[in-house]
């Protein structure tokens, strides 16, 4: 074994850095291993990417946002700069360019052995902060598309100039899909969107940014086990909204009014022909209903706590599909490019320890696993909605560090 550490943190993004900050506060020996460099996950986003939560909610431990636009939304390069400055502010024991290929029990002292691209390391504790974006989730039917159709996952999309002339189909209506539709529409592209079940929330409501209301009404404090969906919420897409140009609501019906062609889910493909599910109306109605239910809860909290707020001034968009087609002919529609906003698949196969459920997702209680010394931090809804966000990832990091 080349080296041994009390604690090894796997992953050097906002979660791993937050853990390192707390470890340094108590003088705990550790090292942070990252396969890339600080900010790489964000560095790979498209050119106009921005946060959808206001800058004031960037609250990494010891490094709250201190810029001039607390209610603005940092762009991609600003996010990278924020993380780089964070790392410089406390100088974590960070090793970039190191891939952890296997984590398992140790046979040579200590609890764990980590096989890395730079040799074997040992540790008494391991905190996994590597996220769940290991592999792009591309539908199986993509392999059946005609060879001259350009296909990109949102991970690989950068700007409209990447794509050939012609219309574009975006598959998936979560945050990435809808924001890429925004980007391409602004560039004058004719857009088609295959709508899924991801919800929406308005950018502003009753005089405040919606994120401020979610905080004020206690949503950020809601433990995952008290969410109506339970732990299944961990695998659902974030509701769509935008921070672009100062922030705005993304309403799929309004996109349609503005010229975006909406379609049901794509269920199969053959060359240039796509088979569509008969679910566009159902999904649009469900999205609207879920949004309305959320706003009713905010209204109730405003009334219950006697909060001074203006009345609801949201304008509803009265648009309905004229006819749901069972197919979409890409050639006939002039579509030469397909972009998948279909999220990612997690892959914890490199962890050779008995802590996973039937789908390969780790079992834990607020990041604490059944294996002594093994923890997870930074996962979506690990404990609350903020667990995977700049705002509250530090709380879970502290919780885990306090248990070491």
Protein language model regions, located:
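Short glycine/proline-rich turn/loop motifs
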Residues: 61-68, 377-383
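Leloir-type glycosyltransferase catalytic cores
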Residues: 70-74
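Redox-cofactor-proximal catalytic regions of oxidoreductases
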Residues: 37-64, 255
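Flavin (primarily FAD) cofactor-binding/catalytic cores of flavoenzymes
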Residues: 2-12, 18-40, 48, 75-404
């Amino acid at each position: 074994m080349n080296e041994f550490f009390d604690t090894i943190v796997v992953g050097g993004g906002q979660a791993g850095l937050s853990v390192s900050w707390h470890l340094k506060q108590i003088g705990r020996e550790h090292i942070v291993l990252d396969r890339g460099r600080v900010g790489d996950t964000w560095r790979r986003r498209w050119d106009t990417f921005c946060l959808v939560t206001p800058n004031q909610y960037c609250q990494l431990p010891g490094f709250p946002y201190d810029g001039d636009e607390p209610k603005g939304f940092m762009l991609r390069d600003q996010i990278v700069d924020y993380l780089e400055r964070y790392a410089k502010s406390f100088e974590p024991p960070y090793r970039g360019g190191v891939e952890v290929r296997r984590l398992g029990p140790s046979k040579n002292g200590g609890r764990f052995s980590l096989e890395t691209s730079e040799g074997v390391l040992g540790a008494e504790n391991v905190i996994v902060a590597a996220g769940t974006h290991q592999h792009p989730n591309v539908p199986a039917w993509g392999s059946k598309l005609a060879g001259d159709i350009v296909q990109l996952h949102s991970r690989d999309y950068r700007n409209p100039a990447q794509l050939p002339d012609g219309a574009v189909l975006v598959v998936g209506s979560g945050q990435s899909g809808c924001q890429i539709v925004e980007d391409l529409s602004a560039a004058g592209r004719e857009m088609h969107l295959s709508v899924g079940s991801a919800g929406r929330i308005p950018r502003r409501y009753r005089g405040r940014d919606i994120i401020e209301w979610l905080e004020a009404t206690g949503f950020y404090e809601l433990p995952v086990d008290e969410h109506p969906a339970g732990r299944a919420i961990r695998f659902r897409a974030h509701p769509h909204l935008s921070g672009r140009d100062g922030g705005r609501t993304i309403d799929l019906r309004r996109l349609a009014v503005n010229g975006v062609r909406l379609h049901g889910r794509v269920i199969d493909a053959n060359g240039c022909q796509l088979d569509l599910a008969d679910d566009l109306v159902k999904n649009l109605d469900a999205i609207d209903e879920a949004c309305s239910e959320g706003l009713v809860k905010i209204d109730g909290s405003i009334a219950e706590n006697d909060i001074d707020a203006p009345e609801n001034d949201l304008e509803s968009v009265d648009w309905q599909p004229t006819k749901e087609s069972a197919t979409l002919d890409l050639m006939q529609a002039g579509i030469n490019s397909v972009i998948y906003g279909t999220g990612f698949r997690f892959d914890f196969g490199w962890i050779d320890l008995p802590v996973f459920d039937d789908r390969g997702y780790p079992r834990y209680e607020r990041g604490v696993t059944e294996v002594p010394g093994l923890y997870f931090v930074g996962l979506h809804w690990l404990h609350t909605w903020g667990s995977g966000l700049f705002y509250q990832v530090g709380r879970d990091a502290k919780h885990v560090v306090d248990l070491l």
